[in-house]
């Protein structure tokens, strides 16, 4: 007799360590692209976040008198650190990685019982707390005009990240920008939103600004998103993630902004822009697809993705956080039990009454 695989078994036929390793490998194209544009600070942030995440995981397991063997066998803490490091601006001070790892591992993961028991995505929990607590530090991204890096650049990056005095930190940032022609800026969505909210701008000037930013000025963000899209396709190819979540998020996000742009004329952004700016592709493929914090049913995952897409549109259009992805995912995580309750498949062996 031929047996069919269950939906959940199909996407969990690999062990946790293999899944985490594939997630890291799939993120490599995006990481390399960020290093190309943002400098070696990206690598520092990832290494720091991994170190702090693994350290906090080790300490909590020791305090709870649990075996630390799983710490090095499932690699979940290390991957959480990688995701936090990718989310942080490249020249962020080292203590942002420290606090991000603390809130992600200790608060969002271990307090709920560890791997497999957390309600909210750990990496996005830590990131969201940092974003609310330190909005200026978390929204300054430094592009380097030159793609050539040498040891002197590495040393200066190190001195900025590990600076202990916040005033000296900002002075080093200014000096670093002048010396290496760095451009410190907010993300494109934040820039455009600020320009739109400037009521002194006429509507034609706003559209001109949006078009210029989309086609010419911020192609670097587009290439970063494309790199993470490639990594997401790799994860889909190896059946590490389910296609229903990323497809439903991207589809619903595009539909809501297309309606807003073409029919209601309320949005100043091209709908396709929403898919390739900010952390959209990174979050859609590497954050929202976390199997622990998403729905376990086929229909539920589609519903979950559509809710995430709707919340992204809602917050980007009417909220104060233009990227909005972290908050959208966390809010959607909170209603996953409700989604699962109403999307449960029919029990095996149950015969529908005629």
Curated annotation (Swiss-Prot):
Could you state one GO biological process linked to this protein?
transmembrane transport
Topology relative to the membrane, per the entry?
Multi-pass membrane protein
What EC number is given for this enzyme?
7.-.-.-
Superkingdom of this protein's organism? Bacteria
| TM helices/strands, residue ranges | 19-39, 40-60, 77-99, 119-139, 221-241, 245-265, 268-288, 295-315, 319-339
Q: Print the keywords alphabetically.
A: Cell inner membrane, Cell membrane, Electron transport, Flavoprotein, FMN, Membrane, Phosphoprotein, Translocase, Transmembrane, Transmembrane helix, Transport
Where is it found, in Gene Ontology cellular component terms?
Answer: plasma membrane
**Do you know which HAMAP family this protein is assigned to?**
RsxD_RnfD
What functional role does this protein have?
Part of a membrane-bound complex that couples electron transfer with translocation of ions across the membrane.
Protein name listed in UniProt: Ion-translocating oxidoreductase complex subunit D
- Gene source species: Buchnera aphidicola subsp. Baizongia pistaciae (strain Bp)
Taxonomy, top ranks, is: Bacteria, Pseudomonadati, Pseudomonadota, Gammaproteobacteria, Enterobacterales
């Amino acid at each position: 007799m031929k047996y069919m695989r269950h939906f959940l078994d199909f996407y969990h036929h690999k062990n946790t360590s293999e899944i985490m390793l594939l997630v890291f490998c799939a993120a490599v194209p995006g990481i390399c692209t960020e290093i190309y544009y943002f400098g070696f600070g990206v690598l520092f942030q990832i290494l720091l976040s991994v170190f702090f995440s693994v350290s906090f995981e080790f300490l909590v397991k020791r305090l709870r008198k649990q075996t630390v063997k799983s710490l090095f066998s499932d690699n979940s803490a290390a991957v959480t650190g990688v995701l936090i490091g990718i989310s942080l601006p490249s020249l962020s001070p080292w203590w942002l990685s420290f606090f991000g790892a603390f809130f992600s591992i200790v608060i969002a993961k271990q307090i709920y019982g560890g791997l497999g028991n957390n309600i909210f995505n750990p990496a996005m929990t830590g990131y969201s707390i940092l974003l609310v607590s330190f909005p200026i530090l978390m929204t300054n991204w430094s592009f380097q005009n030159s793609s050539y890096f040498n040891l002197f650049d590495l040393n200066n990056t190190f001195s900025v990240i590990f600076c202990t005095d916040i005033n000296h930190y900002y002075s080093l940032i200014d000096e670093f920008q002048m010396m290496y022609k760095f451009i410190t800026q907010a993300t494109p969505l934040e820039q455009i939103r600020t320009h739109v909210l400037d009521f002194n701008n006429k509507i034609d000037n706003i559209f001109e600004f949006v078009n210029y930013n989309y086609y010419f000025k911020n192609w670097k963000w587009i290439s970063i998103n494309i790199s993470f899209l490639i990594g997401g396709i790799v994860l889909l190819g190896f059946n590490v993630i389910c296609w229903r979540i990323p497809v439903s998020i991207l589809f619903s996000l595009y539909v809501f902004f297309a309606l807003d742009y073409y029919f209601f004329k309320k949005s100043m952004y091209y709908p396709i822009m929403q898919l390739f700016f900010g952390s959209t592709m990174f979050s859609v493929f590497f954050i929202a697809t976390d199997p622990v914090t998403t729905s376990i049913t086929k229909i539920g995952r589609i519903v979950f993705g559509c809710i995430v897409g709707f919340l992204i549109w809602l917050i980007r259009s009417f909220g104060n956080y233009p990227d909005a992805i972290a908050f959208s995912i966390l809010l959607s995580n909170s209603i996953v039990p409700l989604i699962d309750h109403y999307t449960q498949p029919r029990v095996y062996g149950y015969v529908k009454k005629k």
